[in-house]
Design a protein with these regions (language model features):
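Extracytoplasmic copper-binding redox domains, predominantly the cupredoxin/blue-copper superfamily
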Residues: 2-11, 17-18, 22-112
Length: 112
């Protein structure tokens, strides 16, 4: 009798896995890379989804920040360092470097 239960449970489990995959609920967060070089962000515009990670790598010889105008994030990135932020809400976020205000970029965050 236990073998009969196991054989019935397998198709149910397979259906649950397929349903989860089709729903997108198991989607893996993406990491979007932004380089800081020559007093600039590159690329200057990216698109992410809620839950994705933005990763800045500072290859300049001086410190920079990635500071959101709306307050969503504010990270300081030392020379040779990397900083990461998980985006948590949809919308367009413009950000800049506090030390070098002409350094500007944006991220468009889409809902999951």
């Amino acid at each position: 009798m236990a073998a009969g239960r196991a054989s019935r449970a397998l198709p149910r489990a397979a259906v649950a896995v397929v349903a989860l995959a089709l729903s997108g609920a198991g989607a893996v967060a993406e990491t979007l890379h932004v380089a800081i070089k020559d007093l600039g962000f590159g690329p200057t515009a990216i698109t992410a989804r809620v839950g994705d990670v933005i990763e800045w790598t500072n290859t300049d010889f001086i410190a920079h920040t990635a500071t959101a105008e709306n307050g969503d994030f504010d990270v300081e990135i030392e020379p040779g360092a990397t900083a990461r932020v998980i985006v948590s809400k949809a919308g367009v976020v413009r950000y800049y470097c506090v030390f070098h205000p002409d350094m500007k970029a944006s991220v468009t965050v889409l809902a999951k």
